[in-house]
Amino acid sequence: MSVNPDVAGRSYPPAPPFQVGREAVRGFAEAVQAQHPAHHDVAAARALGHADLVAPPTFAVVIAQRAEAAVVADPELGIDFSRVVHADERFVHHRPLVAGDEVVATVRVEAVKSLGGNRMVTTVTEIADLDGAAVSTV
């Protein structure tokens, strides 16, 4: 089955709330070799004015992928995940993600384009706090 271009513009329900945990921040920082003390040491993060550990900027993808699972699983879109090639990713951070944050991610299919006999699917995931304030766009 090929990717259905008519799904462009579709939004999906929010993923369940995600609690940003200290150990998740530390583990991710270690995995991506982010050495800044604010990712590992609460006192260092607080000295910079943050309430707790600051997640590395790319940590937002952990949250975004939970929402993007709905896109991959959508039978109307028709994605064969075994044929997916990741081409591009951009982050816009409205504020840092900090341990203790509880956030919700909502994804939409921004576009479905033909490219070299294949389809390119562009998604946008909005991450917000529980009050609806923007945190990151992936």
Please provide the spans of the model-predicted regions:
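HotDog/MaoC-like acyl-thioester-processing domains
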Residues: 1-6, 86-88, 92-138
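Hot-dog-fold acyl-thioester-processing enzymes
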Residues: 1-86
